[in-house]
Amino acid sequence: MKVRNSLKSLRARHRDNRLVRRKGRLYVINKVQRRFKARQG
């Protein structure tokens, strides 16, 4: 999992990316291409 400053640009890289908030942190998850996992904060 990558830690990034801006998740909005990462989310646009694949159409199956989802932006999720868990425990005060923002995550990008992707069930199809798991290599797009990232978090912020």
UniProtKB/Swiss-Prot annotation:
Keywords: Ribonucleoprotein, Ribosomal protein. Coiled coil: none annotated. The keyword Mitochondrion does not apply. GO terms for biological process: translation. One of its GO terms (cellular component) is ribonucleoprotein complex. One of its GO terms (molecular function) is structural constituent of ribosome. PANTHER family: 50S RIBOSOMAL PROTEIN L36 2, LARGE RIBOSOMAL SUBUNIT PROTEIN BL36B. Belongs to the bacterial ribosomal protein bL36 family. This is Large ribosomal subunit protein bL36.
